[in-house]
Amino acid sequence: MKIFKRCFIGLTLTLSLLLAGPLFLAACAGLQDSGSWRTADRSSAGIAPRPEQEQAAVVQVYGARAYNWRGYFSLHTWISTKEAGADGYYVHEVTGWRHYVVRSRLDDPDRAWYGAPPTLIADIRGDQATRIIDQLDEVIARYPYPTEYTAWPGPNSNTFVAWVIRQIPEMDVALPNHAIGKDYLGNGVVSEVPGGSGYQLSLGGYFGILAGVREGLELNILGLSMGINPLALGIKLPGVGELAFRSTNPMHEPSGSNSEPETDAVPQTGAAGAAEAGQVSKKTL
């Protein structure tokens, strides 16, 4: 009886901790409905550089709160790219309302996601961005779930972005802990983290643990992740995301009229460090 009581108390405390963040966000929003997706804001946030102002290649990763109540728990992420000298951006993402869920199309790179403003997660420019773009079409064509979409625990839009990042050694980007689906590995159990320097163990996206230089430490329970990020001086809360003093992802810093390739401040190890430009990395076991 005591064992049952302890298990019940432990389960209650765990669920309370996991749901505290989403419930807090819901309370702050007043539990208001987001309205119709047809009329929700999809305008550009003006974050990405205009093509006429930036001649260099650009690769950016964005995230925005998922539509309606799902936004209390998770993000929708996507990749935006512009080739050197191009006059527009391509947006690469997964959506759940088509048979073929993957789409790459000309579009504004930083549009609001049905009322939710986007946040820039990573910004890579110059020669490094060109090398990433050169590999992107071939990598996207190999995405293993082109007609599958499951909001929880995956595969979903975050699964797609995390998978693409893992396949391109130079695209080492840590996704936010509340991007539910990023830890979905399909039939795999162990993988390198998207950030490139570290590993994770995941059981179908429901449970797992992650340790990486960019990501820090994360514990995944039922798709909701919590943890700490020593390099960013931050903590990770379910639903809320990472509260940190700095970003560990590559970010462009203006230094004149034209961009130079982003220099990585984080040491690269494993497959990411050993791979050369143009080589596809297979990081999931």
Question: Language-model features: where?
Answer:
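Hydrophobic alpha-helical membrane-spanning segments
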Residues: 7-14, 28, 55-65, 69-79, ...
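Intrinsically disordered, glycine/charged-rich N-terminal periplasmic/extracytoplasmic linker segments
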Residues: 97-98, 119-133, 184-194
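Mid-length scaffold segments of soluble, non-membrane domains
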Residues: 105-170
